[in-house]
Amino acid sequence: MSNDEGETFATEQTTQQVFQKLGSNMENRVCFDCGNKNPTWTSVPFGVMLCIQCSAVHRNMGVHITFVKSSTLDKWTINNLRRFKLGGNHKARDFFLKNNGKQLLNTANVDAKTKYTSPVAKKYKIHLDKKVQKDMELYPSELVLNGQDSSDSPLDTDSDASRSTSKENSVDDFFSNWQKPSSNSSSKLNVNTGSLAPKNNTTGSTPKTTVTKTRSSILTASRKKPVLNSQDKKKHSILSSSRKPTRLTAKKVDKSQAEDLFDQFKKEAQQEKEDEFTNSSSSTKIRQNDYDSQFMNNSKGNNNNSIDDINTQPDEFNDFLNDTSNSFDTTRKEQQDTLTPKFAKLGFGMTMNDANDLAKQQKESQKIAQGPRYTGRIAERYGTQKAISSDQLFGRGSFDEAANREAHDKLKTFDNATSISSSSYFGEDKEVDEFGNPINSSGSGAGNFDGRNSNNGFIDFNASADDELQMLRDVVEQGAEKLGSYLRDYLRK
C-alpha cells in the first residue's frame, strides 16, 4: 500500500516486529530524554523512543529539527522504520558518549532544543541518514530484519563489503596459523628431560642426612613436566589465534599396579613414623649429653666431698635424666591429645542440662503467663448489689464482716414493708399512751391529738382522712408506674 508521494507503507505486523525487536534492549524501554518507563512515542529523525510528555516538547521544536509519531497508533512507512531498525536509544547514547556529548545525556537541567540542535546531534542524524541510505540500496522495496542490525555499533561507518572481506581474511588467518602438534614431540621431550639429569656432587663436602622417600613410577611419570627448547617454542603473533590450552589426562592403572601403590603408600607412612621416632630419640640423646657435660663442668668447682657424693650416687642421676626424658615425652603426648579433636559423649540431644530444673522453670513461667483465673465467686457474692468498695471486696480497712452480716439480717425482717423508720430499724422502744397509740416526742398522741387541738380534747378526724388520701394517692401512682412500665415493655417487643 502506498501514498501519493510514492512512499510505501509497512504492514502492522512489520511495525510490531520492528518495535518488539527494539524493545528487547533495556535502554529502549525508557525515554531517551527523561528516563520514564514504557515509552510509546518516537522521534523519527533521530530514531529514539520518547514518552508522551517529551513528545509534546519535540512537537513544539518544529519539523525542521524533529517530528514525532506514535509507535502504536500511527501508520509507518518503510523508510521511517529503517531509522529504528538501524537506530535506537542504545546506539544514540553510544554515539553521544563517544563524541563528547555526555553532558547532553543528563535527564535533568538539559534543554531539549539545545540537545537536538547541538553538533553531536547533527552528526548522529547525518550518520543515521547514511546507514538508512545503504539499507535502501540493499533492500529498496522491503524491510528486512537481520540479527546483525541490533549488534552493529553506531560508530561503524565501513561498508558491508569491507566487513565481509575482513571476516574472510580473519577466517583464513585462523586456519593458516593453526598447526597440528608434531608426532615426534614425545621423543624430543624424552631427550631434553634426559639431558637435565642432576650431576653427581664431586666436591668433598659431606651431604646432610635427609630422609629419602620412594615414589611410584606411575606417579613420577605423570608428574614430569616437559621442557622445550627455544627452537621448539611457537611464535604467536597478535593476529594469530590463541594458544591451545593444555589438558590434563588421566592414565588407567591396572589392579596389580593399584595394589602395589597401596602397599607402597603404607610403607612410606611407616617409614615416616620411624623417621619421626628416630629424630625424637636423637634429640633426647643430645639433651642428655648436654646435661652430662653441664654437670661435669659444674662438678669441677665443687669440693672433694661433693665429688665423692656424686660418684657414690650415679644411679640416681641416671634415673633423673630418664625421668626428664620421659616427662618430655609425656608432655608432648598430652599436647597431641589436647590438639586432636574429640566428640563429647553426652546423652540424648548432645546437650548438658538438668531436666528437672528446666521443667520447674517452665512451669513457673506458665503460671506467670496465665495469671489469676476467674472463678465466679465475686459475681455470686456481690451480683445483686449496685456498688461495692475495695475494702468490702478484699475484707480490709474499715470493713467489718460481723456488722455487715447483722445489717443484712435486719434488712431481711423488712422485706415486705413499704417503709421503715430509724427507731424500728435500730430496735428502739416506743412510748404508748393509754389507747395503745405511739406518743410523739412532744408528749401528745400523734394519732389522736394534734398540737392545735390539744387543749380542747376533741379527736381530729381530718388528719386520718388526709392520711387515707395520701395512701390512696400512693397506690394510684404505683399502679400508674406499673402500667406504664408494662406498656413500655410491650411496645419494645
Curated annotation (Swiss-Prot):
Q: Which GO terms describe its molecular function?
A: GTPase activator activity; zinc ion binding
What are the start-end ranges of the zinc fingers (C4-type)?
A: 31-54
Return the Polar residues bias intervals: 278-296
From the UniProt record, give one GO term of the biological process aspect. Answer: endoplasmic reticulum to Golgi vesicle-mediated transport
Q: Which InterPro entries match?
A: ARFGAP/RecO, ArfGAP_dom, ArfGAP_dom_sf
Q: Where in the cell is it found?
A: Golgi apparatus
Q: Where is the composition biased (Low complexity)?
A: 176-192, 199-217, 297-311
Question: Which stretches does the entry tag as region Disordered?
Answer: 145-255, 268-338
Where would one find the signal peptide in this protein? none
Record-linked Pfam families: ArfGap
Give the keywords, sorted. Golgi apparatus, GTPase activation, Metal-binding, Phosphoprotein, Protein transport, Transport, Zinc, Zinc-finger
The superkingdom listed in its UniProt entry is Eukaryota
Tell me the residues on which Phosphoserine occurs.
S170, S306, S389, S398
| A Gene Ontology cellular-component term | COPI vesicle coat
Cysteine disulfide partners in this protein: none
Q: Does the keyword Protein transport apply?
A: yes
The residue ranges of the Arf-GAP domain are 16-137
Misc remark for this entry? Present with 1510 molecules/cell in log phase SD medium.
The record's function comment reads: GTPase-activating protein for the ADP ribosylation factor (ARF) family. Involved in retrograde vesicular transport from the Golgi to the endoplasmic reticulum.
Protein name in the entry: ADP-ribosylation factor GTPase-activating protein GLO3
Q: Organism source for this protein?
A: Saccharomyces cerevisiae (strain ATCC 204508 / S288c)
Classification from the root reads: Eukaryota, Fungi, Dikarya, Ascomycota, Saccharomycotina
* Gene name for this UniProt entry: GLO3
